[in-house]
Amino acid sequence: MAPHFTVIRDITPDSAIPRGAVVAMGNFDGVHLGHRAVIAAALEMGRAQGRPALALTFEPHPRRFFSPNTPQFRLTDERAKLRLLAGTGLAGAVVMTFDKARAGTTAQDFIHHDLIGRLGIGGIAVGYDFHFGKGRVGSPSLLVNEAPRLGIEVDVQPHVDIDERPVSSSAIRIALAEGQIDEATTMLGAPWFITGEVIHGEKRGRDLGYPTANIRLDANCGLKHGIYAVRVGRGSERLDGVASFGRRQTFDNGAPLLEIFLFDFKGDLYGQALDCAFIGFIREELKFDGLEALIRQMDDDSARARVLLAAAPDAFPKLGTVD
């Protein structure tokens, strides 16, 4: 049985925070390989010191606070991020609310009041480019310089490169927007996934022999419209399928929707929350002259999806349980 993952929202006098813990600090959007290097450093530091290791992260994402009217494509919402963090071996996460007060806290106050005073950290791991505090004055070098006086260990992780390019959340967003699923998967260390509740549709897919589980995604989802090979998680069960994301051009040019056809599955999924991992990009959206042409293409899409999925039989993100 996996150890319990504790989530602490903000820090109050009543918070059950294990003082002296080692923290991995960051926004962790996507929990990609660069983030995982920071987490691994915190876990190793914790083992060496005999201390638990926690994530320290912020919600909403600071970009959302500073630019509330700018569309933000997040790789992971708060719950998805926490589920990924729970799968890394960390003991828990402290989620700090990023609001006006937090944005106005100086880096020195954050270090002394929050990290040392409230959390009493024994060590901290950060990425090379992580900044914090008012005006983003707080930096890895500031933590390193303060460490001897504070009596804590600081680990600064360099960037992780793939094909001589640094891994970043921005690079992953670009890859997803271009339908480069393999590239995004490599940078993430696992397939990108979304979670959503199955809603009722117009049941046109059923009439075509392809009944779908329909999920509305965030309006700011930047995934390229098209057809994908997907693997769906329903609890511990894994179901393979093919999915269409975008506007249903053949019918009504409606709002973007994820429509998933699951192979070899019969059952009612309405109202259930599914995790959908994107394994491969098959093609862009097309508009068909008639239903026969559409069905032939759907048959071909399904065959191609089965090949992609068979080549990656274990591809799925490692997710922990979050209360």
Region spans (language model):
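Positively charged, low-complexity intrinsically disordered leader regions
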Residues: 1-22
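Active-site rim/loop-helix segments in enzyme catalytic domains that contact anionic ligands
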Residues: 18-25, 33-92
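Residue-level signal for inorganic ion chemistry
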Residues: 32, 85, 124, 184, ...
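Cofactor-binding loop segments of dinucleotide-utilizing enzymes, especially the Rossmann-like FAD-
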Residues: 58, 98, 159
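N-terminal Rossmann-like or analogous alpha/beta NTP/dinucleotide-binding catalytic cores
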Residues: 64-128, 132-150
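Glycine-rich, Lys/Arg-enriched anion-binding loops that position phosphate/diphosphate groups
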Residues: 139, 144-246, 322-323
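Phosphate/ribose-recognition catalytic cores of enzymes acting on nucleotide-derived substrates
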Residues: 201-323
